[in-house]
Amino acid sequence: MKTQVLSYNYNREHIKPGILHIGVGNFHRAHEEFYTNLLLEDPTQQDWGICGAMLLPGDERLYRILEKQKKEYTLTICGRDGKDQTYQIGSLIELIWGIENPAAIINKIADKNIHIITPVSYTH
């Protein structure tokens, strides 16, 4: 079965981070990133890209994968009707590996263009 991927229509080069999210895990990518991806389709909302900050040693593998993929990934939503939708997500504009560069996170917190800071929701 061939999967159709619905791609975003905005130019990522024009998107500016307005949200800093600390802890870029699965829940964040399936929810906050998805809805932000939809918002960025509106040309008047191009200042709401996401900067992700990853802090834990266990996050390094995902950080490296996302960097290699230019911070893009796909998300499949399994419909109750049995029809799935796969989206290309491009709302993650910037990614900081806090273990290598903790000062970059502090600088991003102080960035005047960051309007919202959201923390990781689920921890062990």
Where do the protein language model's features map onto the residues?
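Short, charge-rich binding segments
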Residues: 107-111
